[in-house]
Each structure stands twice: as structure tokens, then as C-alpha cells.
Amino acid sequence: MTNDALIAALSHLVSEGRNPDTMDIDLLPSLDIVQRINQQDKLVPLAVEKVLPEIAQAVDKITDAFKVGGRLIYMGAGTSGRLGVLDASECPPTFGVSDKMVIGLIAGGPEAILKAKEGAEDSPQLGEQDLKAIDFSSNDVLVGIAASGRTPYVIGGLEYANTIGATTVALSCNPDSPIADIADIAISPVVGPEALTGSTRLKSGTAQKLVLNMLTTASMIRLGKSYQNLMVDVKATNNKLVARAARIVMQATECTKEEATEVLKQTNYEVKLAILMILTDLDIESARQHLHHQDGFLRKAVESHKSN
């Protein structure tokens, strides 16, 4: 695409428009600047609310993929790519899953996480290559993330995913975007022009983060990774998380800190197993088998034991 054509294309994007509420932002003192930005930020959850049905549809597809050993792959450039990497990296400690289950790909590779490599997004071939490098398959789900909805790297990835029969999801902050047109599911929270024209790390980035949070959190809940609203598959990999594990057991069972700590040590800090042992008085092996029979769903394991 020529420079003139690119300028013309960008001029039609909502995310590249000038915001009439911040035209004088360069004249304002600090408090007024951040108040203007905050006023714009308040619009983000309202935009996300309008696309909840599409988000839920994507959650169902992701959950189905996980159940057959598939993966969730995020793909984006710049801020969009970093947000995908961030959400993916939080899944292992939060939900106790493999770091291969949710993967974030960013145009330009790992170096682009810390230092912008803006030109890397211009190659659709790179998107396809990055997916092939991780053995992307039809069992996986690809979420292409691009605030503009027209990033070549993401388009290339989505097109390749379509050719092999994988489920594709487009996350954009512009209506009727190119990536929305080629994906199975289009999630398009339109947040309007940014406080600083074209700086899509602002409202657009916030909207993307909210959506990604929902995709992984809701999918993991559907897989039994929570009990009530507690993170019962959390991995106690540092002192803070060891303390959190004990607190979760105490909250779920109303036991003492001493009992929670004792049982957690027996289970090698498997929170879900510790809770089941305390609530049912089962020994560790019986509790493990009972949990396995309920596909890892702690609530089902507790209730089925009570009914016997």
C-alpha cells in the first residue's frame, strides 16, 4: 500500500479520529489533563458491554478447544501484541496450566515486547510463519488483536488459520474492520477517538485488556479452575502465593490457618485437593480420585460426596 493510500485508509478509522473533547488538552494543567483522560476511559467498559455476546461466543469456542487439547493463541503487533503476551503469561500462575496452553505472539518476536519494532507488523507472511513455528493446528483458537483492525501481520495469521480450519476471533476497536471480515467471531468494542489522536495504547488498549481478561478467565472457570469465586488452581510459586493459597483454603472451608497450612503441605500446595480433603474428610488419595472422577470440578466433587 502506498503512503497516500495508507493516509486515506487511516483517515476513515474511528480510532484515528480527532477527539473534540480534548482539542485543548495541550493548554491544560496536569489535573485537568488526567481528568480529561479519565473521562474518556469511562467510556471503555460501556463499549465492551455492547460486545459481551460475541465475547461469550468466543469463550465457548476456546473452552471447547481446551477440552480436546487445543490452545489459545493471541497474535498482535505493538501494544496489541504486548497485551496478548501479558494475558498469556498470567495463566500458568493463576490457573495452574501449562505455559503452552495460552500463547502470545507479537510481531518482531520477544524483543518487541520491550522495544517497539513497528515495521514488523507490515508483513502478513510473518504472521503465517509465526503460527507455523508453534505448530498451530485446527484444534487451536487464534485471537487476532489489532486496534485498527487492519494490521497485515494479524491478517496474515488469521487467513492462514482459516485455511487449516481453526477457529478465528478478531479483536478490533473499529467497526467493520478487515480482520472482523475474515474471522469467525468479531469482537469490536468501539471506544471512539483517543484523548491523544491515534494513540491506541489508551482507550483501545484498555478495551483489549478487558476483553482478553474475560476470554481467559471465563474459559478457565468453564474448565473448573475456580470454586465459587476462588482461584483454586493457583500455583504457590512465591511467598505471596503460598500465603494466598492458605487464605483461599481458609475462605473455602472456614478452617484455621494452622489446619490450612498442614493440609496444604500434605498436598504439596494443591489448593483444590486441600479444600476437598478438609470439606469431606477424605484422605489424599481418595480425594484425588474423587476429584478426577468429577473432571477437576471442585464444587461437583464436594456436592457428589455429600449426596453419597
UniProtKB/Swiss-Prot annotation:
Segments forming domain SIS: 62-225
Coiled-coil regions listed in the entry: none
Keyword Lyase attached: yes
Catalytic residues as annotated in Swiss-Prot or TrEMBL: 90 (proton donor), 121
Example GO biological process: N-acetylmuramic acid catabolic process
Gene3D superfamilies hit by this protein: 1.10.8.1080, Glucose-6-phosphate isomerase like protein, domain 1
Recorded catalytic activity of this chain's protein: N-acetyl-D-muramate 6-phosphate + H2O = N-acetyl-D-glucosamine 6-phosphate + (R)-lactate
Molecular function GO labels: carbohydrate derivative binding; carbon-oxygen lyase activity; ether hydrolase activity
Pathway(s): Amino-sugar metabolism; 1,6-anhydro-N-acetylmuramate degradation; Amino-sugar metabolism; N-acetylmuramate degradation; Cell wall biogenesis; peptidoglycan recycling
Keyword line: Carbohydrate metabolism, Lyase
Highest taxon in the source lineage: Bacteria
Enzyme Commission number(s) of this protein: 4.2.1.126
Function: Specifically catalyzes the cleavage of the D-lactyl ether substituent of MurNAc 6-phosphate, producing GlcNAc 6-phosphate and D-lactate. Together with AnmK, is also required for the utilization of anhydro-N-acetylmuramic acid (anhMurNAc) either imported from the medium or derived from its own cell wall murein, and thus plays a role in cell wall recycling.
NCBIfam families attached to this UniProt entry: N-acetylmuramic acid 6-phosphate etherase (TIGR00274), PRK05441.1 (NF003915), PRK12570.1 (NF009222)
HAMAP family reported for this sequence: MurQ
Quaternary structure annotation from Swiss-Prot or TrEMBL: Homodimer.
Family statement drawn from the similarity comment of this UniProt entry: Belongs to the GCKR-like family. MurNAc-6-P etherase subfamily.
Note: A lyase-type mechanism (elimination/hydration) is suggested for the cleavage of the lactyl ether bond of MurNAc 6-phosphate, with the formation of an alpha,beta-unsaturated aldehyde intermediate with (E)-stereochemistry, followed by the syn addition of water to give product.
Name recorded for this polypeptide: N-acetylmuramic acid 6-phosphate etherase 1
